[in-house]
């Protein structure tokens, strides 16, 4: 019976050996390992996650996949010797990359830049060689130390003090403690910990101080994961609640009121004296500056007797007084459609053209609350609503509503010392200078940046609303004459002489909405 038994044992051993051969052959020819301890990274820093490949050989041409929960959520895919950005999750594009140098030594290091709270969790690296693959897991922990704590104090009517400690930018949720100067911990009365869209926590912790013997309190906020924290200390004021009789309180209030009245009277008298002294100095200084300007900065300009050109006037503009006044009406005139006539903006040009020299004229605006005055190139576009800016050949200032503006590309707001009733236009063609003055007080309204003119320039006028008194060009009394003005005059220096060629305008209020003006807005 022994021989059959030994034969049976031999057959069983051979069978087991044969069954194990396919299993051994099917095992992957490499292993993938990863550190067991989590990798810790601070918010905003860079994190490196590494897994190893053994036997220690080059894995440069193998397929490598770093992923989170499933293989379809690729943090990084390395295939055919390069990273496949098209397969990468959106939140990791531009932040996750592979240290390719380690692949030659059998290491795969994933570099995540600008770490966020949402990056925390498990990452798996998978190596694939043909049909063989192995994977390992690495865990990333994220932490952040927040801002320095701030303590605010509120004293209650009963003498108790409420302290509130606030700080932001922590992760994970921090631990907050109140401590006395003797390092004794006290409980909080309320505590709030909220996280923002980035996942970082903001804490606000309050407590009440009822023990008057406590001199100092500190707020300590700790990140348990990092073993780091921040602390701030505040000194508490000594309690002082004096017992006062009613008559002492009344006397104190009366004395305090008398003291305030005395101080106020002294301060008011001193301020009034300083203001009067300043005004006297300013008046004296203005006279001195005027004399100096008269001696050093006189510019002689030729006063022009400007008249309006009816061939350029918009059909709603009516000219009066030998083409020296213009008014905007609701009715539309039947006029020849000339190339030089404005058909959209309610504008008109002067007859005079300037190609050189220095020129000057005045316009009476009176109490009108809407107008535009200046110069323009003779060949400006007069059809349609092209913007009236220097780029399009217009240099003008305007009043619309309660605002004064220079018609620059972005419309420059002007701050004037007072509303001008008469505006002087100063043109120095050769110097490329256009300036506007308030002839009522001699102050400068606006000067356009210097420009090199080319081609003829003409006076330019525009009105925005109907039914008001005309805009009037001031006439020279006895023909063209020389007028002396101050160059770059200050706001508080009067300009002289002003001329007497016009009367004041009307006092109507603005009611029209003709910006932009279109012929379709008024019936003929």
Swiss-Prot record:
UniProt-recorded name of the protein: Butyrophilin subfamily 1 member A1
CDD domains associated with the record: SPRY_PRY_BTN1_2
Keywords: Disulfide bond, Glycoprotein, Immunoglobulin domain, Membrane, Repeat, Signal, Transmembrane, Transmembrane helix
Domain Ig-like V-type: start-end pairs: 29-141, 149-235
Subunit comment: Seems to associate with xanthine dehydrogenase/oxidase.
UniProt signal peptide: 1-26
Disulphide-bonded residues: 51-125, 165-219
InterPro entries: B30.2/SPRY, B30.2/SPRY_sf, BTN3A2-like_Ig-C, Butyrophylin_SPRY, ConA-like_dom_sf, Ig-like_dom, Ig-like_dom_sf, Ig-like_fold
Transmembrane segments: 248-268
Source organism of the structure: Mus musculus (Mouse)
Protein task: May function in the secretion of milk-fat droplets. May act as a specific membrane-associated receptor for the association of cytoplasmic droplets with the apical plasma membrane. Inhibits the proliferation of CD4 and CD8 T-cells activated by anti-CD3 antibodies, T-cell metabolism and IL2 and IFNG secretion.
Segments forming domain B30.2/SPRY: 286-480
């Amino acid at each position: 019976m022994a021989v059959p038994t030994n034969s049976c044992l031999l057959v069983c051993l051979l069978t087991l050996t044969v069954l194990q051969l396919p299993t051994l052959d099917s095992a992957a020819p490499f292993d993938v390992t990863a550190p067991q301890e989590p990798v810790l990274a601070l918010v905003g820093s860079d994190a490196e996650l590494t897994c190893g490949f053994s036997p220690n050989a080059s894995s440069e041409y193998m397929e490598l996949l770093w992923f989170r929960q499933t293989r379809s959520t690729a943090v990084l895919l390395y295939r055919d010797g390069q990273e496949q950005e098209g397969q990468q999750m959106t939140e990791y594009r531009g932040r996750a990359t592979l240290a390719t140098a380690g692949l030659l030594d059998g290491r795969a290091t994933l570099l995540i830049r600008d770490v966020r709270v949402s990056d925390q969790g498990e990452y798996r690296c998978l190596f694939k060689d043909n049909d063989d693959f192995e994977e390992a897991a690495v865990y990333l922990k994220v932490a952040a130390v927040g801002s320095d704590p701030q303590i605010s104090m509120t004293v209650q009517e009963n003498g108790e003090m409420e302290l509130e400690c606030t700080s932001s930018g922590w992760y994970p949720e921090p631990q907050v403690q109140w401590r006395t100067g003797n390092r004794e911990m006290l409980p909080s009365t309320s505590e709030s910990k909220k996280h923002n869209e980035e996942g970082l926590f903001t804490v606000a912790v309050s407590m009440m101080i009822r023990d008057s013997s406590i001199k100092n309190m500190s707020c300590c906020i700790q990140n348990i994961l990092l073993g780091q924290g921040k602390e701030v200390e505040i000194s508490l004021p000594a309690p002082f609640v004096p017992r006062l009789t009613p008559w002492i309180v009344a006397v104190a209030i009366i004395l305090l009121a008398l003291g305030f009245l005395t101080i106020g009277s002294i301060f008011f008298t001193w301020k009034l004296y300083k203001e009067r002294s300043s005004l006297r100095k300013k008046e004296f200084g203005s006279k001195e500056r005027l004399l100096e300007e008269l001696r050093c900065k006189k510019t002689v300009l030729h006063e022009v007797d400007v008249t309006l050109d009816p061939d350029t006037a918009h059909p709603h503009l009516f000219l009066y007084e030998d083409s020296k006044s213009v008014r905007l009406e609701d009715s539309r005139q039947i006029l020849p459609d000339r190339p030089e006539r404005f058909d959209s903006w309610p504008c008109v040009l002067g007859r005079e053209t300037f190609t050189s020299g220095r020129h000057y004229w005045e316009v009476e605006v009176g109490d009108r609350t809407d107008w535009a005055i200046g110069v323009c190139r003779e060949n400006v576009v007069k059809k349609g609503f092209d913007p009236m800016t220097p780029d399009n050949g217009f240099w003008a200032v305007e009043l619309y509503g309660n605002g004064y503006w220079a018609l620059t590309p972005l419309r420059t707001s002007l701050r004037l010392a007072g509303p001008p009733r008469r505006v002087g236009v100063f043109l120095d063609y050769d110097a490329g200078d256009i300036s506007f003055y308030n002839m009522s007080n001699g102050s400068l309204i606006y000067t356009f940046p210097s420009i090199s003119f080319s081609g003829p320039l003409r006076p330019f006028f525009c009105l925005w609303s109907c039914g008001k008194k005309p805009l009037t060009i001031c006439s020279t009394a006895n023909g063209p004459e020389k007028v002396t003005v101050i160059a770059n005059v200050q706001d508080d220096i009067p300009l002289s002489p002003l001329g007497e060629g016009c009367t004041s305008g009307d006092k109507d209020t603005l009611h029209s909405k003709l910006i932009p003006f279109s012929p379709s807005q008024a019936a003929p």
